[in-house]
């Protein structure tokens, strides 16, 4: 009798599904369906039942459509990209260490990585003056990436590098913009103490002509337009497949509420960033309009490193956030952020309209204090998310409006890895945000928030990339994953062998696929943004929903010592040859 395990592809066997003392490893209904699907694979092909034109009641011979095992598995393929170093292009707009980079890219290509991601720094390209764009160094970089057959995700980085976790270089926003800020510091985000954050421009100046006759949004638009014009060959040839639009600090759609340059230390709740004169004036006008001129911007929300329960605003049982005044402020604060993202994504959509690529925007994974009533760290960042109010649905709807991918962070994190005092819930947060995107019918991608080289971190990413494991439909499945970040430590052993094992699992144990349409990633011309729903409608749809079902652990895990054994095997074969 043929063994059940013998019928299965050995690459798919995972001990977590085997129940001791049982010859059949069924954990629940969904697991049973996956197992039955895998058992239908025999001799490299999968037979899928097809309904005939005649009625199903007629007892005629069943017709089958034969699909290859590889084709079916590719529906579960998640492409993986690697972020290049932050300073791969220097402040002087020069591509340094070109030969070293080529060696690294060659190694990445051999590992079967799908592509790379790179920050295209506003502070470098437009440093000489308004509309004086210098793209030569980036063109040189893109040509090298193309020569290795790698795809490219380009970030329109309208923020400063330096001051965020992991920043190892300092690249400010353009000097001529900073000089405008010297005479008008209210162009920058400001906390209640009056401290300015020069990491990026405040959303309050999006539509103010303060920058040599242009608004902030017009500067972002012109920059993206120049990028498209100067990189047309890389776009049309399919090298550049993704434009991530910077929308705030670290390129993320949020306020700079937890900046290390301001003294923030994890897990501080952060501070609201709406005290520049433009946002202050806007709020005062809004409260007068609704008949509450006595309402002021919060002065009782603590400081960067406060604990929620120690503040009057975030106090769990009777905090300001629970009252009418607090609710109005948080609605206004989050709405300003949504308007900001909506407007810039609309400009990006117009700039890249018709291009065969995706646009994307990143949302920060603020997981600390998630398991408290007030979600204080999320609120100060602009995500109005509570137990009875979903703060991510509106963001997902904005992405849907502009045909954009929602890119989320902290996919590698587990609750048990976080300090108890932080009340963190990265697993629940990831499930909530990804589910919000999938429920809206948009593509969702992700990143790790911190560098990881261990199988536990990788296994958590694999789980979040395919929450229900490998299955016939491949859904739900993340559109892609970008690994943070290329380094010598990643490329050294045994880390690199573990990373290659991770790539294999993300690719559903298939070889690198150069034809995206085979895993349902065909790039079509970008369509114009939808305008069938207003932002006000988005803001009203805040009812929480249960997240999609999620396995406890991935069905394609990297097992203990697996990468080490792979390394020993490859070393042995190399020496033997």
From Swiss-Prot:
Name the chemical reaction catalysed here. Hydrolysis of (1->4)-alpha-D-glucosidic linkages in polysaccharides so as to remove successive maltose units from the non-reducing ends of the chains
Q: Which residues form the active site?
A: 252 (proton donor), 447 (proton acceptor)
Q: Which InterPro entries match?
A: Glyco_hydro_14 (IPR001554), Glyco_hydro_14_CS (IPR018238), Glyco_hydro_14B_pln (IPR001371), Glycoside_hydrolase_SF (IPR017853)
Alphabetical GO biological process terms: polysaccharide catabolic process
Q: Where in the cell is it found?
A: Cytoplasm
Q: Name one Pfam family in it.
A: Glyco_hydro_14
Q: Name one GO cellular component term.
A: chloroplast
EC primary class: hydrolase
Positions with a binding annotation for substrate: 119, 159, 167, 362, 367, 409, 448-449, 485
What keywords appear on the UniProt entry?
Carbohydrate metabolism, Cytoplasm, Glycosidase, Hydrolase, Polysaccharide degradation
Q: What is its EC number?
A: 3.2.1.2
Give the GO molecular function terms: beta-amylase activity
Family (UniProt): Belongs to the glycosyl hydrolase 14 family.
The entry's protein name is: Beta-amylase 6
What organism, scientifically named, is this protein from?
Answer: Arabidopsis thaliana (Mouse-ear cress)
């Amino acid at each position: 009798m043929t063994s059940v395990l013998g019928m299965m592809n050995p690459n798919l066997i995972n001990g977590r599904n085997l129940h001791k003392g049982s010859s059949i490893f069924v954990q629940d209904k969904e697991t049973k369906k996956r197992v039955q699907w895998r058992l239908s694979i025999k001799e490299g092909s999968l037979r899928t039942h097809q309904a005939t034109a005649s009625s199903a009641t007629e007892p005629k011979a069943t017709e089958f459509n034969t699909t290859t095992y590889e084709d079916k598995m590719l529906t579960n393929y998640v492409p993986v990209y690697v972020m290049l170093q932050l300073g791969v292009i220097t402040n002087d707009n020069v591509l340094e260490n070109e030969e070293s980079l080529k060696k690294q890219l060659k190694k990445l290509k051999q590992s079967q990585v799908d592509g790379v991601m790179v920050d295209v720094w506003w502070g470098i390209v437009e440093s000489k003056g308004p509309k004086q764009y210098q793209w030569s160094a980036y063109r040189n970089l893109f040509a090298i990436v193309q020569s290795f057959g790698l795809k490219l995700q380009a970030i329109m980085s309208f923020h400063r590098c330096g001051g965020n976790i992991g920043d190892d270089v300092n690249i400010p926003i353009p000097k001529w913009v900073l000089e405008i800020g010297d005479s008008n510091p209210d162009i920058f985000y400001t906390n209640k103490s009056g401290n300015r954050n020069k990491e990026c421009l405040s959303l309050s100046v999006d539509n103010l002509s303060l920058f040599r006759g242009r608004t902030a949004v017009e500067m972002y638009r012109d920059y993206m337009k120049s990028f498209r014009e100067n990189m047309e060959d890389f776009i049309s040839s399919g090298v550049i497949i993704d434009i991530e639009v910077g929308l705030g600090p670290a390129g993320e759609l949020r306020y700079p509420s937890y900046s290390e340059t301001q003294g923030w230390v994890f897990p501080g709740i952060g501070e609201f960033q709406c005290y520049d004169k433009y946002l202050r004036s806007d709020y005062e006008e809004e409260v007068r309009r609704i008949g509450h001129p006595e309402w002021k911007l919060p002065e009782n929300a603590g400081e960067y490193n406060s604990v929620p329960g120690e503040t009057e605003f975030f106090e769990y049982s009777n905090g300001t956030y629970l009252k009418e005044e607090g609710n109005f402020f948080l609605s206004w604060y989050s709405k300003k952020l949504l308007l900001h993202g909506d407007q810039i994504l609309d400009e990006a959509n117009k700039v890249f309209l018709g291009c065969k690529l995706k646009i994307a925007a990143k949302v920060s994974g603020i997981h600390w204090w998630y398991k408290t009533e007030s979600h204080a760290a999320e609120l100060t960042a602009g995500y109005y998310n509570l137990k009875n109010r979903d703060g991510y649905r509106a963001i997902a709807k904005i992405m849907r409006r502009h045909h954009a991918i929602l890119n989320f962070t902290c996919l590698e994190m587990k609750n048990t890895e976080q300090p108890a005092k932080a009340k963190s819930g990265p697993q629940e947060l990831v499930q909530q945000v990804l589910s919000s995107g999938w429920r809206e019918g948009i593509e969702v991608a992700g990143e790790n928030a911190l560098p990881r080289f261990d199988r536990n971190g990788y296994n958590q990413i694999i789980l979040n990339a395919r929450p229900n494991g490998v299955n016939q439909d491949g859904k739900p499945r993340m559109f892609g994953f970008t690994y943070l970040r290329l380094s010598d430590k990643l490329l050294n052993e045994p880390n690199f062998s573990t990373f290659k094992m991770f790539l294999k699992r993300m690719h559903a144990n298939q070889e690198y696929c150069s034809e995206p349409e085979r895993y349902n990633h065909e790039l079509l011309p970008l369509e114009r943004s939808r305008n069938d729903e207003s932002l006000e409608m988005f803001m009203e749809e805040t009812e929480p929903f249960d997240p999609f079902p999620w396995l406890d652990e991935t069905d394609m895990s990297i097992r203990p010592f697996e990468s080490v054994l792979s390394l020993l095997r490859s070393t042995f074969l190399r020496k033997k040859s």
